[in-house]
């Protein structure tokens, strides 16, 4: 999303995913009244775009998995939808897309999985990820990293990923 975008770099060896690094790029709406809404949006998009591109340059991934946005119910939601779609379109290598429902079903097993269930699943599967813990459980704010980890698993069961595996053997 425009507010929080999590990126996870992982390695796949013999069918086992290992999380190597993770970041969350955060942007916040300007509180200054004299800043135009469009200028604020452009600035936030710039922060997001630069952060994503720097992360891709740092790790040089062979494959990128992304969660495509789902329907929005408001003008603000639709704006975020557009920003997300544009960001996905600019990625190189071209991203393998999954939906929020595919992500939840591929990991927790139900399309109605809660944020807490998604975090618990990701934490159990990848304790090596850079979690910030409170009482031995990741903070709720880390739902974005948990989702990014889950997106990897959903992406790995797509026909697009199967095709890539078949041509790179």
Question: Where do the language-model regions lie?
Answer:
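Phosphate- and other anionic-substrate recognition elements at nucleic-acid/protein interfaces
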Residues: 1-169
